[in-house]
């Protein structure tokens, strides 16, 4: 039985909490794509954990965790994150996490190149996290990357890294990068990594009758194929990416949970039709504490975009939704939701593939009354204010997928689970 948790918007929806809840009953928790550019925050027993490349199923003491073949792994960050978790009491974390030997290595060199590539874009910057994810996936696609399994073979990293560095030097000139230092670090990692590296299919076969939880990173609107290209990440962040990155049998998927924030946020550049560059956006940013887990950057904020959510649903085929951060809307007199786009005065029935076109759309809003009541920590549906219930039901009806969970605060316990 496989359960997927996927982001429905631009990321930062709060996927970590529902993953944390579901992982308590999971035997195996997996990351399928992306790298340490992702960021999940989980508050468990009053301890705050920040996850980037590691699956957040590590909080559950019985859960085995896999970083899958579709990911890119920055090895220093892997060990640093593991050390931080063990420092917060997860002493056996190193015994319950494995990396597919087919995952690719994200080098410090890639981070340097990431910054150089952004600089060449001038006013059309993508707004990457600067972690080297794009250049790493580029090297993978060009068949010149290094797989995690190859780190264990003496001399492979040195040969390939020298070749990569020479290629980038020809392109950019001198690099602010210490090639020899990185080569020497990987001589140490060859021994350190060995206990963590596995054949993914062998591990999955051992868990073929187990409860498997797939933790999506980033979100559908950042998908390399289906997102707001080119303002996207460099991996497949939707349903297709999870199947590809983990070699899943699609017939084993029992549920696909889409995580939707009760309003919209975005980090970095790119079109954002419902963005509020005004007091409303500022209020959402401050009240919601909208800062990136990975970069610390302020998130751009706006109203919930149901056009985008319907598009996301059509691609990811959600069977249930988790609406998060409802409590952030507690102090609004009225709340708007985007229900349609207009282009040149006419309502359009498609989601634009061209980012420049998406920048030009006129948003059609519906306005719903606020509830002006504190909802933080509410755990029962009947305890929600009537207008909050109506807001949730409106979203549910528009998207056409049941909202099974409603987040009402940062703690694990701040969640309503509705009977279906």
Swiss-Prot record:
Q: Which cofactor does it need?
A: Mg(2+)
Q: Provide the binding site for GTP.
A: 11-17, 39-41, 299, 325-327, 407-409
Q: Which UniProt keywords apply?
A: Cytoplasm, GTP-binding, Ligase, Magnesium, Metal-binding, Nucleotide-binding, Purine biosynthesis
Q: Record-annotated residues binding Mg(2+)?
A: 12, 39
Keyword Zinc among record annotations? no
An example of a Gene Ontology cellular component annotation for this protein is: cytoplasm
In this chain, substrate is annotated as bound at 293-299
Give the catalytic activity: IMP + L-aspartate + GTP = N(6)-(1,2-dicarboxyethyl)-AMP + GDP + phosphate + 2 H(+)
- Annotated IMP binding lies at 12-15, 37-40, 129, 143, 218, 233, 297
Enzyme Commission number: 6.3.4.4
Q: Provide the transmembrane region boundaries.
A: none
Kindly state what the record says about how the cofactor is bound.
Binds 1 Mg(2+) ion per subunit.
Q: In which pathway does it act?
A: Purine metabolism; AMP biosynthesis via de novo pathway; AMP from IMP: step 1/2
The residues annotated as the active site are 12, 40
Q: Which domain of life is it from?
A: Eukaryota
The EC category is ligase
Question: Which biological process annotations from GO are given for this protein?
Answer: 'de novo' AMP biosynthetic process; cellular response to cadmium ion; IMP metabolic process
- Pfam families from the xrefs? Adenylsucc_synt
> Can you name one GO molecular function term for this protein?
adenylosuccinate synthase activity
Compartments reported by the entry: Cytoplasm
Subunit field text: Homodimer.
Q: Which family does it belong to?
A: Belongs to the adenylosuccinate synthetase family.
| Reported function | Plays an important role in the de novo pathway and in the salvage pathway of purine nucleotide biosynthesis. Catalyzes the first committed step in the biosynthesis of AMP from IMP.
What is this protein called in UniProt? Adenylosuccinate synthetase
Q: Which species is the source of this protein?
A: Uncinocarpus reesii (strain UAMH 1704)
């Amino acid at each position: 039985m496989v359960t997927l948790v996927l982001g429905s918007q631009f990321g930062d929806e709060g996927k970590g909490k529902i993953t944390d809840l579901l992982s308590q009953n999971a035997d195996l928790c997996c990351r399928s794509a992306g790298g340490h550019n992702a960021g999940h925050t989980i508050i468990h027993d009053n301890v705050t954990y920040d996850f980037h490349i590691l699956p957040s199923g590590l909080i559950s003491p019985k859960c085995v965790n896999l970083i899958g073949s579709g990911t890119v792994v920055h090895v220093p960050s892997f060990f640093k994150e593991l050390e931080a978790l063990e420092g917060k009491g997860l002493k056996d974390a190193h015994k319950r996490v494995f990396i597919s030997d087919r995952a690719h290595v994200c080098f410090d060199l890639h981070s340097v190149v990431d910054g150089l590539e952004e600089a060449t874009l001038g006013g059309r910057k993508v707004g990457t996290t600067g972690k080297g994810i794009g250049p790493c996936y580029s090297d993978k696609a060009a068949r010149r990357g290094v797989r995690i399994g190859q780190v264990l073979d003496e001399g492979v990293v040195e040969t390939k890294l020298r070749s990569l560095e020479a290629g980038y030097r020809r392109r950019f000139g001198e690099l602010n990068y210490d090639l020899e230092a990185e080569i020497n670090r990987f001589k140490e990692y060859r021994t350190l990594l060995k206990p963590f590296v596995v054949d993914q299919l062998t591990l999955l076969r051992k868990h073929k009758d187990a409860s498997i939880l797939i933790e999506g990173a980033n979100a559908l609107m950042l998908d390399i194929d289906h997102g707001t290209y080119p303002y996207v990440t460099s991996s497949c962040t939707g349903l297709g990416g999870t199947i590809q990155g983990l070699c899943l049998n699609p017939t084993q998927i029992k549920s696909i949970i889409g995580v939707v924030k009760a309003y919209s946020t975005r980090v970095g550049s790119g079109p954002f039709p419902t963005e509020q560059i005004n007091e409303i956006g500022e209020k959402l940013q401050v009240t919601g504490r909208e800062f990136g887990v990975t970069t610390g950057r302020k998130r751009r904020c706006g109203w919930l975009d149901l056009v985008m959510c319907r598009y996301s649903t059509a691609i990811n085929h959600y069977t249930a939704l988790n609406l998060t951060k409802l409590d952030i809307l507690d102090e609004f007199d009225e709340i708007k939701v985007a229900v349609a786009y207009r282009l040149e005065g006419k309502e359009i029935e498609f989601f634009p593939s061209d980012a420049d076109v998406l920048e030009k759309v006129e948003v059609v809003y519906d306005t719903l009354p606020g509830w002006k009541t504190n909802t933080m920590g509410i755990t029962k549906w009947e305890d929600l204010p009537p207008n909050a219930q109506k807001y949730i039901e409106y979203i549910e009806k528009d998207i056409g997928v049941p909202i099974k969970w409603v987040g009402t605060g940062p703690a694990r316990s701040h969640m309503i689970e509705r009977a279906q």
